[in-house]
Amino acid sequence: PFQNLSQDAASAFYEFALADSVITELAQIRSIIVRPSSVIAKYQGKEVDPREAGRELRVHAVLSAGFIRAGDKLRVTAQLLDVVSGDILWSDRIDAEGSDILALQDGIAHRILEGLRLELTDLEAEKLGKRATDNAEAWEEYLRARDHFGRFIFRTIDAEDCDAAIACFKRAIELDPHFALAYSGLGACYATRVFKGLCEPEDYSYADASFSKAFLYDQHLAVAP
């Protein structure tokens, strides 16, 4: 997870959600293997040595990043570290308006690929160039939802966290009714409640309807959150 260097509680959801969204972006590239969000969740809120974490995860490189939000500005400092040699493969500082988190995420993913000197296929380049939504507010609600859902799945199993995720996914959909990832996330919430025995009677049908909407708006959706 990214480190919240400003210790701003209102921005804490970016810690897991930004890392999670970058993972989702990079997972579309066949030539690299990216560890899923489930394995990074345990590092959230902790001081972690990147090389030690990399050895534990059995990866060749680790992205280490921190962010500071001040007013409407968001600054991310990031570096990609070679786990074996300790060499920095890529490092950069990326500034963005707080309302343009989409551009920030896209920038991080593309600069990592540049640092690794990877050549993309035409289809991979097309996928990376396609935004899940152009609505910045919808994307922020989606990130909040992912943070709540990640907390529910990996840390608390508290129904309130899942309920909060559902509310955020629904707000994202209200802001962008064609937001496939938000429908997919909403479906995952309902399905997880069913699997964990926390469900309401209609949750199964809600999950099915949400996933159907997700694939209606994006038939190539690779990952259901």
Question: Where would I find each of the regions flagged by the language model?
Answer:
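Acidic, proline/glycine-rich low-complexity intrinsically disordered segments
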Residues: 1-225
